[in-house]
Structure formats: structure tokens, C-alpha cells
Amino acid sequence: MRTFLLCLGVWLSPSVWAAHAYAQFGDIKYPEGFSHFSYVNPTAPKGGEIAMVSPSRASSFDKYNPFTLKGTAPPGLGSLMLETLLTGNSDEPTTAYGLLAEDVNVAKDKLSVTFRLNPLARFHNGDPVLAMDVKYSYDRLTSKEAAPQFRTYFSEVAGVVVVSEREIRFNFKRANAELPLIVGSMSVFSHKWGADKPLDKIITDVPIGSGPYKLGQVDFGKDIQYVRDKNYWAKNLNVRKGMFNFDRISYRLYKDTTAQFEGFKAGEFDYIQAFVAREWARGYKGKLFDNGTLIKKELQHGNAGDFQGFMFNTRLPKFKDARVRQAIGLAMDYEWMNRQLFYQAYTRVRGYFVGSDFEAKDLPDTDELNLLEPMRDMLDPAIFTQPVPLPPVTSLDPASGHTLRDHLRQARDLLAQAGWTYRDGALRNAKGEAFTLEFLDNSGSMGRVVTPYAKNLEKLGFKVVYKVVDFAVLQKRMDVFDFELISNRTGGSEAPGTELLERFGSKSADTEGSSNIIGVKDPAVDALLDKVVAAQTRGQLVAACKALDRVLRHGHYSVPHWYGSVHRVSWRAGRFDQPNITPRYYQPESWIQSTWWATPANFAGVR
């Protein structure tokens, strides 16, 4: 997620900003010298513990290094043990403030940014955080030994200069108002961590970070605990006051979601988030919920919606034709699923910027056309003449023209246009090859969705396979693009930016481990991504994202799923207190970890 940060403080000259915070555009809530964020309790007691489960689908971990492609790092390590030059907050999704850096200066031409480090900043080994550590971190993260997304993310950085012991400057290849935000969000670790090894050979060496927690007890691969650093350098800093109150934060990892939920009811951990509507409606009930042992709550939030869908691997020849992809999408009867499977709990995903100002609607507006016209020859003419594609809405009215039968008839016509017809018991191309579809999953939770979907696809002649594999196998197959159709979710953003280069850019399409899972390779998309990154005003950003969303949706690169408007969470009663104010923009796990605190019963070890 791209973060906007607001430049605050004193104008030192017409060409340089210097402040405790920086922004691409917008206003800020907290002035220089503010005491604490509004959604925390600055006098919250320290102590107690909270036990959680991995927010990802990982069932184990095999390394402590979160920056390499191979293997799985434990949950929580990056956010609890490592820190960045700047930190965001949950009031303002586009604003951040100094953390490791106490001062930030952006040149008027936006070709460089200089950070001055806080002299109080210390790593867990007691060493001061110095400019050479920041440069060491950057050099490591942009090396070929690191996961490829870091090289994409920092691709516009021309170089890093150690100005003095506590001053570091990032030079940029071109003026880009977002770049100070990007480098400000880079994890910083000590130059002593793995100094004698290539980054991809640092596996079980514990990162030397500066965060509020250190590594505690570990059952390697299964459970991990983090312990609060009593000498944490930033505990009295305004961006940390009233935060990270638990003495111990632990994670337990389970083989599957069934074992995980049974562990929760048995008291093995304290907090869980539900992602499946059926489980929330049918599983989160019974004696423990009725007698108040477990609390079940739907939390409101203002986050942009996440995109989720079945994503095609367009590197495969059979998915190259957009008509084929569109036809497969027409076979999903979402309305039936929402009635029968989802308890009417979801809204259909329409585009790649769910529920935000960046979502394309109807025909392109004037600002979009100004971006699209110069590339008209590269684009489908329908982009200019037809409303942006929406997922099909299945009607039960035979006269509507939008029944499932109507959609399947339309899909059959599209497949025929693309050279796929039904004969000899299957959908075949001119060579006689049958069209198979493999849906890959790791938890089995998509089975109830794929089963009715597969029945509709089989009516068109597809041979459908639903395959469940271990998370590690799934991750590896995703990394090397060895899949056909896969369910995937990407986080929404209040300010999309450079992360989209990695998600949709041609340069990342064939880079193993990249987040361009679909394999998008489109010069028009690349040109629009450049407009997104180069946006100087929010209006320019909105126009560029809407145009990008429009082009991607006309490409039918995925079968959109659904999203919910609330966080569905449950926790053990009597063990925690929380601030009176709930922020607008937050993820529940990080909000609970960073702002809640232990009750006297928790301190006493009562579960």
C-alpha cells in the first residue's frame, strides 16, 4: 500500500521542506510536537500477553529472514522487530510521521530526500541506528539475493549517499512525489545482521532490528513468541506512546482452519478473524459464545476494499485470448452463491480498486480520455465506446435476458469465436485438444465455491479439476507461475502507487516470486502505471487509476469474487481492554497488537 505523508513544520527555503512528517498531497491531523495519536491510551499499563494465529494461510515457517523469496518467515517478525524511517497511523491513511528519522528534507525538484536519524534510536544489541545501517539495508534489499519485489519497489532510486553519521540521502532517477514515501517505508536492520553471508543464505540468523519486541521462545516451524523490549528506545516517542503494551505476543500455527478454530475454542490462543461467511454464521455460536467466554463482533472500518478473484495465468496459451477469459467468468452464478453459500454477507467485486474513488465507472470521463487517447491504437476500441465491464448479474426472470442459461449461451459464442467448440464430449480447439481447468487451493475452503461453478463450466465442455495442496506447495507454484486458476486477494489502498508496477507491470510478469500473478504484459497498462506513479495531485492519481482499472477490466484477467464491509473478529473475554476510540483505517490484528492492553486477570494469568 502506498502511504501519503504530509510535509509539515517550517519552510526552510523555497527549495527544501524540513519537517517531522511528509506528504505527497493532503492535510495532516497532528502538528509538530503532538503528544500521542488520538486512538491510543497514553497511560495504558504494560504487561500481560496475547496469543494469536497467523493472518496468512501459512501452516509453518522455516526461516527468520522475511526478505528472500525461498521459504516462509514467521508472522509478526517484520512489524514487531523491525522499523522504518517513517511510520503511518490509523487516522490518516495518506500521512506518516518520523520514527527512526526525526527529520525529513525533500528537495524542491523532488530528485532527492534526506533523512536525519533520531540520536536515541537503538538496535536490540544496543548499537545506535546509523546512516550506514540504512544504506546497508537498502543495498541488501535491492540485491539479486532479495525477493524481486524489492527491486521493483525501489527501481526509481538512483543511489543512496551517507551524508554523515546520522544523515542519509536518497537520490532519484526522476522527479516523483511518491518516492520519499517509498524509501521512508523501507525496513532498516543492523549492518551486523548476516554481514558475512549473502542475503539468501541468512536463514536462521535472527534479524537485528530496533522494534518494540525481541524474539522470545520459539518452537521452530510451529509457534513463536515475541517479548517486549523493556529498554525500547522509542517507548516515549509520540508515535509510540500508549502502544505495544503487551509483554508477550505469540503466534500459533495450525495445519488448517478447522484445527485452528478448535484450538481457539479450547483456549490455545486469544484472538481470531473469520474470513468465511458460512463459518462466521454457523461456527461462531454455542455455549462459549452464549455464556460470554468468547466475544463475537463485527467491527466497522473505512478501509478501501480488497480485490479478490480467480486469477488466470495468462502465460499459458489457452488463456491468451480475452474472449476465453470472459467466457469463463460468465459461468459464475454469484447471485446463487450469495444466497446459498454466503448468507447475503458480501458485495460483488467489480474492479481492481474496490469501493474507492479510483474505480472506473460507465464511460471514460474527460480526465481519463486525456490519458487514453494518445494510446488509442494500443487499446480495444470498446474501451472508448462501451461502459466499463461489470461482472454478470444472474436473474431468475426468464424474460430478463440475464439468466444463467443466457450467460452460458453468451459464453459459448465467445469460446467459438476464440476457436473452442464442443465436440467428442469436451470443449476442443482446432487441434482437438480438450480444455482443462485446474483450480488450485491450499485450505479446501474454496471447494464449496468451485463445485457449483465447475458444474456450470462443465456445461460448456470444460474439464474441471479442483486441487488442494499444502500452503508451501501452493506458494512455490505461485512463485514459479505453475498454475492455471488460483484464488488470490490483494489489499486495497487509499492511495495506490508504486506497488502496482509489481502487480501489473510487464517487467515483473516473468520474474519469479513477483505479485504479477496474472502475467499482465500490456504496453498500454505500462504507460498508465507510469502515469499513476508520476501523479502530482490527487486528481491526477484518480484519473490514472480509473483509466488503469478500465483497461484491466476490459482485459478480463480475473473472475471477480466478493468482499465484506466489516472485520469479523472474536476474542477471549476478560483478558483485554481497548481505547475508547476506534480508528477509521486499520487491520484488526495490528490494531489489537499495538493499542490494546492486558486486564488484571490477564496479568494474573487467568485464561
Language model feature labels by segment:
Residues 40-45, 67-76, 103-147, 163, ...:
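Aromatic- and charge-enriched surface segment that lines or borders ligand/interaction sites
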Residues 98-108, 124, 129, 153, ...:
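Aromatic-rich, solvent-exposed beta-strand/loop patch
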